[in-house]
């Protein structure tokens, strides 16, 4: 006669019924609970998998897979001919007993911590760029189209990187990045930007922010003044400030950074941070005259130029300027770019091009920090570039992005008073809609969210320049119908209140 099942076998079903399609995970969590609370004690025998499957109405395979996982973790042990037993000594995290309770921080202690917090963190907000498990909604900016990415081709490149003969992809990589990706990046920059740089000048990093942080560590000292376009990427100025640098926001007009005003307040900065090819979030392209002023200022002050390039591969017609790195002050230019916009965000690969004389310094510091980007994605990306797949993808996406830009322009055209001004849209996948008084961009963004539309507040992209007020609208990741529907909500909100009436809460 079969031995009766212990009570916990039925209790776990009552406590938390199995979820369809998640049988293996449910079994694992159920066994984990009874182990933690002591209902299944060390040294006790587990009922046969067949009987558990019958009692729980689950496939036998789900029981076996969950038990295999617990055996791999040292929780269960198999005795030949006698089934599975709970280990006599459980791993520390699986020991029985009540769940640990984290004592709340007393309010007074929390206040002291906040008082000690550096002023450099004032205004910092937890990143809301991605909400786990939820796709972005139109018109959120900073999101590329991933639905049209050639995933099958990318899988083949990844598979090649993990082939048996490529076991090196499982090891640590060189701090400056794999030679294959640095060579591919140098060729890519020649084709897309007209740059002339060697593979040795390329440092592979995980993001443009990591590149900026590395520049600060290698070239700048605490207290050095850094002039930055204002507004800019919301994290850039804050990151530089966290490096104990004196960060000064510089306004700009339709020609680019206001060099005259910047020189009056900061005649000799240590570095100038800007996006001359296509400024985010405003979309402004620095004019040739303003570029000459900028180079004169940098030359006179011997300032480093941190030239950041977001998605300049996506140009919507017209002549594309060469980077400042191609000009007469190339020995003072640090060029920063990323693959996340042209590939997909999860790839987490970007690049930094440094002057030849600084290669050893940057590689050494990155090595000392223990930084390196994962090898396999680098090898896969190098193959993806060299085989022409990235070029093919870019050609297709330029057409898609241009069409979506046109949809946004048409959807807004003539539907708002002239006081609502749409910024230039010559490249990239976002636009800036400047708002007149008395509208508040933060309040508008909140109201749009209640209508199911996402947008960014221009004022939250600022550092020290007052009066920024606008909406940062993304269009790259959304179908035409989604863009049109979102604009309808935006127009209904903005056109529904006359200038001078109270703004929406």
Regions found by a protein language model. Give the residues of each.
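Active-site PLP attachment segment
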Residues: 326-361, 373-376
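Helix-loop "lid/cap" segments that line or gate small-molecule binding pockets
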Residues: 185, 351, 379-387
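Residue-level detector of anion-binding/catalytic polar loops
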Residues: 76, 225, 246, 304, ...
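AMP-binding (ANL) adenylation modules
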Residues: 460-466
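Hydrophobic residues in well-ordered beta-strands that form the structural core
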Residues: 228, 249, 307, 381, ...
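Conserved core of the PLP fold type I
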Residues: 157-301, 313-331, 401, 498, ...
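N-terminal basic, amphipathic alpha-helical segments
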Residues: 1-159, 357, 363, 367-374, ...
């Amino acid at each position: 006669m079969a031995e009766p099942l212990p009570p916990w076998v039925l209790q776990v079903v009552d406590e938390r019924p199995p979820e369809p399609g998640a049988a293996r995970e449910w079994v694992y969590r159920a066994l984990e609970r009874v182990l933690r609370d002591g209902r299944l004690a060390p040294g006790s025998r587990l009922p046969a998998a067949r009987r558990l499957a019958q009692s729980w109405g689950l496939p036998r395979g789900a029981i076996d897979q969950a038990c295999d996982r617990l055996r791999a973790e040292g929780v269960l042990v198999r005795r030949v001919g006698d089934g599975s037993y709970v280990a006599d000594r459980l791993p520390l995290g699986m020991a029985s007993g009540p769940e640990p309770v984290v004592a709340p921080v007393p309010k007074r202690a929390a206040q002291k911590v906040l008082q000690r917090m550096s002023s450099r963190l004032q205004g910092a907000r937890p990143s809301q760029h991605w909400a786990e498990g939820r796709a972005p909604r139109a018109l959120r900016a900073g999101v590329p189209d991933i639905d049209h990415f050639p995933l099958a081709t990318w899988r083949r490149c990844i598979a090649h990187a993990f082939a048996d003969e490529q076991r090196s992809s499982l090891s640590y990589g060189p701090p400056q990045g794999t030679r294959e990706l640095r060579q591919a990046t140098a060729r890519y920059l020649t084709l897309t930007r007209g740059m002339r740089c060697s593979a040795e000048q390329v440092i592979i990093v995980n993001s443009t922010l990591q590149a900026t942080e590395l520049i600060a560590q290698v070239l700048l000292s605490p207290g050095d003044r850094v002039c930055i376009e204002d507004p800019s990427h919301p994290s850039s100025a804050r990151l530089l400030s966290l490096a104990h640098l004196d960060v000064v926001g510089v306004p700009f007009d339709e020609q680019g950074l206001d060099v005259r005003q910047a020189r009056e307040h900061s005649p000799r900065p240590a570095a100038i941070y800007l996006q001359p090819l296509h400024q985010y979030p405003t979309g402004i392209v620095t004019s040739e005259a303003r570029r000459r002023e900028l180079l004169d200022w940098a030359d006179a002050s011997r300032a480093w130029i941190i030239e950041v390039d977001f998605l300049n591969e996506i140009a919507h017609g017209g002549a594309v300027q060469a980077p400042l790195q191609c000009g007469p002050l190339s020995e003072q230019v640090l060029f920063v770019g990323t693959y996340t916009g042209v590939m997909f965000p999860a790839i987490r690969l970007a690049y930094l091009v440094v002057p030849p004389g600084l290669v050893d310094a940057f590689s050494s510091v990155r090595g000392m920090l223990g930084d390196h980007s994962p090898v396999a994605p680098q090898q896969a990306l190098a193959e993806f570039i060299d085989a022409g797949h990235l070029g093919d993808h870019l050609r297709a996406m330029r057409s898609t992005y241009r069409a979506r830009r046109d949809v946004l322009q048409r959807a807004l055209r003539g539907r708002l008073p002239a006081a609502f001004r749409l910024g230039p849209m010559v490249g990239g996948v976002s636009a800036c809609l400047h708002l007149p008084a008395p509208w508040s961009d933060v309040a508008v963004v909140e109201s749009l969210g209640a209508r199911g539309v996402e947008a960014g507040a221009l004022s939250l992209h600022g550092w020290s320049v007052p009066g920024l007020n606008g909406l940062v609208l993304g269009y790259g990741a959304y179908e035409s119908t989604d863009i049109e529907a979102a604009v309808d909500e935006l127009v209904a909100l903005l056109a529904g209140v006359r200038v001078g009436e109270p703004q929406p809460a």
